[in-house]
Curated annotation (Swiss-Prot):
Keywords: Amino-acid biosynthesis, Aromatic amino acid biosynthesis, FAD, Flavoprotein, FMN, Lyase, NADP. Its EC number is 4.2.3.5. This is Chorismate synthase. It comes from Escherichia coli O139:H28 (strain E24377A / ETEC). GO terms for molecular function: chorismate synthase activity; FMN binding.
Amino acid sequence: MAGNTIGQLFRVTTFGESHGLALGCIVDGVPPGIPLTEADLQHDLDRRRPGTSRYTTQRREPDQVKILSGVFEGVTTGTSIGLLIENTDQRSQDYSAIKDVFRPGHADYTYEQKYGLRDYRGGGRSSARETAMRVAAGAIAKKYLAEKFGIEIRGCLTQMGDIPLEIKDWSQVEQNPFFCPDPDKIDALDELMRALKKEGDSIGAKVTVVASGVPAGLGEPVFDRLDADIAHALMSINAVKGVEIGDGFDVVALRGSQNRDEITKDGFQSNHAGGILGGISSGQQIIAHMALKPTSSITVPGRTINRFGEEVEMITKGRHDPCVGIRAVPIAEAMLAIVLMDHLLRQRAQNADVKTHIPRW
């Protein structure tokens, strides 16, 4: 299976399955001399891990990360960093009934078509369990970006179902189980989740991720545009069906006189572009949004077929998230951090000596 690696200079390769012995990743390209401990990675892993609230899957995984290599006496050595998380709460028997059945809306059918077989236990490699390693690797990138460049990356839920959420107060995001920046909507979200659990159904969501303090000049002009790489990274997250940069699809209704981000001696007057112009960062906040579909792992009966082509009725058993968008927030932060760190290292490698007299704000 190819496609397990992201990045050029900062490279992250993950491995493992939902019900395997462990998950792991190799992180290449981390500069030497950076203070790094397992505790630095654990905070974001705890934000993502299952079983932390009644609104997410009740699979209880401690997600304790182990640093296997690349760190000596508390600092990075510049060599490959190996990370490992053991799986401890698998219930593979929950999936025995779907051994020969394709769950509608899942990767069961496509994996079988591609490989001729599949690991049916929790989706195997296609499970969002894999994203734990992305979060661990992303925590390294977030630490480097914050300490070396003052870059802050934050994410939040900005819509669940038909409930829009305004970014009113970033300080509230970590104070509720929804990563919600709009405290006035917490009760509505709680009511929706209770209804979904009662119905055995699920709902989609929108997640917004913002990077502040990103210097101008990151990104390449054509195929490796910064926004293209961000979109690629976010689209690689399980259940993501759409990505927007800045105003995204809303620009369709704007005129050029409205959409252009005018510049004065005091800086940009707007940020419809989401901090990226011509595939290169402008120095403004980088803003991206991603839409996540409602999970198909629900107890509402649905039609499908088995491996023998016979039509059957499907009811998903096991422990699942009614809204996968909730735990996707730290994953989105991690993927944005991975892309930004990769492009910072690439910019430093090629253009470290470039000096301009153009104002920067």
